Amino acid sequence: MSMDLNFWKYKEGVTHDNDRIYEKACCDGQPVEELESLPIDEILTKIASVFSDWTALDKAHYEKEGQGAFEVFTTSQIVRFDCYGMQEADLNALMDVLIGFGCPLYDPQISTRFDEWTDR
């Protein structure tokens, strides 16, 4: 099974339009005025640390025998994981990394952003 997990952080006081942000920023890779810039290098370093027992084919592609694989796509404002055959615990580990940077998960499979803990 494959799925994508998407993360961003809104600027303070802007209107939230999750579907538009997903399409424009996460799918098309375009900058969006309503979003904060993210510390992408720090995020990638944290991902590499958390998944240090996985094979890193490069900074954006990870795989592990029997555990699946994932690809990381970033712009200065978003992080998107395309996940293939991953276990729930590993998916949760990806989510935890981005939550640590104040970025809630948006799941396009159900058109839901899990942001009840933040207004950003």
Feature-to-residue mapping (PLM):
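Acidic (Asp/Glu-rich) sequence patches and key acidic residues
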Residues: 1-120
